[in-house]
Amino acid sequence: MPPKKKKVTGLIKLQIQAGAANPAPPVGPALGQHGVNIMEFCKAYNAATESQRGWVIPVEITVYEDRSFTFITKTPPAAKMILKAAGVEKGSGEPHKTKVAKITQAQVREIATTKLPDLNANDLDAASKIIAGTARSMGITVEG
């Protein structure tokens, strides 16, 4: 007889600095209300994201009935990758009037290659268009 599947009681989505998860908000309260061992998650997350320090890494935590959990880390948000490629702190307050920076088509393709598993796109061209659109909505011009 196959083992019984664990019943899922919650799905938590967070964006946490890589290698820097701690029990303080937003991590503690989000996990605490589901009864998850917060320190156990923090240690596991920090170990899993150690190589990506400096990035914000989205994570999906699945909580089960017995208070155990599993988590899946995603790729860094496209907006953060675009800002880093453009070398600016934040996007434009008026994206279609005031442009704050420029990125090349090659940089867009590089970001699209990284983000492809998490994007709703089947090929690199479609992913590049999604990334270019995100850049435009942040007031960053795409050249090429």
Curated annotation (Swiss-Prot):
Disulfide bonds: none annotated. GO terms for molecular function: large ribosomal subunit rRNA binding; structural constituent of ribosome. GO terms for biological process: translation. One or more lysine residues are methylated. It holds the Pfam family Ribosomal_L11_N. Keywords: Methylation, Ribonucleoprotein, Ribosomal protein, RNA-binding, rRNA-binding. Forms part of the ribosomal stalk which helps the ribosome interact with GTP-bound translation factors. Part of the ribosomal stalk of the 50S ribosomal subunit. Interacts with L10 and the large rRNA to form the base of the stalk. L10 forms an elongated spine to which L12 dimers bind in a sequential fashion forming a multimeric L10(L12)X complex. HAMAP family: Ribosomal_uL11 (MF_00736). PANTHER family: 60S RIBOSOMAL PROTEIN L12, LARGE RIBOSOMAL SUBUNIT PROTEIN UL11M. Belongs to the universal ribosomal protein uL11 family. This is Large ribosomal subunit protein uL11. It comes from Streptomyces avermitilis (strain ATCC 31267 / DSM 46492 / JCM 5070 / NBRC 14893 / NCIMB 12804 / NRRL 8165 / MA-4680). The gene is rplK.
